[in-house]
Amino acid sequence: MSALAAFRQTAGRGQGDHTWFATPGLNLTFSLLLRPDGLKASDSVLLSCTAALGIRDYLLGAGIDAGIKLPNDIWTGGRKICGLLIENMLEGKYVRTSIIGVGLNVNQTLWPAELPNPVSMKELTEHSYDIREELPVLCRCISARAGMLATAAGRAALKEEFDNNILHII
């Protein structure tokens, strides 16, 4: 797995025509390149499971309990802390490469009025984070979850835990 982070993201995007807002230097905005060996395209939802649960693990380590809001968000306390965007390149019936875009609100405390319900780690924990130190920690959490893709038992465990952490927000 490889990561490419942006200290300043100028054209962040989300699902559909949504954009991602991040003040330069305050948040983690990065993409992961993953080459899941032997993952069938029909099982590509497991890549969402991998990323979302890895991010959830990271947040739990920071004392933040979070859940998954389908299709691609991580929420805590009724507010959005992270967004995901996953694009897969297929080769036949298999996922050859996956690019997982992550936008995690880390130190941001001021938000544009048009953003609905954003929250950051700093707002929740009253602690400032060095994003350069936090990125490898978060990547290790996601990488550990990606390792579960290698076996049928790991894939089943990912799916079950993912399903158990879906938020039902009305």
Model-predicted regions and their roles:
Residues 51-93, 103:
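Acidic (Asp/Glu) carboxylate-rich active-site/surface patches
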Residues 93-125, 131:
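Short, acidic (Asp/Glu-rich) active-site segment that either coordinates a divalent metal cofactor
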Residues 10-11, 15, 76, 104-106:
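Short, glycine/acidic-enriched loop or turn micro-motifs at the edges of active sites
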Residues 1-61, 82, 128:
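N-terminal lobe of the biotin/lipoate ligase/transferase fold
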Residues 124-170:
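Conserved, helical-rich catalytic subdomain that frames metal- and/or nucleotide-binding sites
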Residues 5-7, 31-33, 69, 85-87, ...:
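Short beta-strand segments
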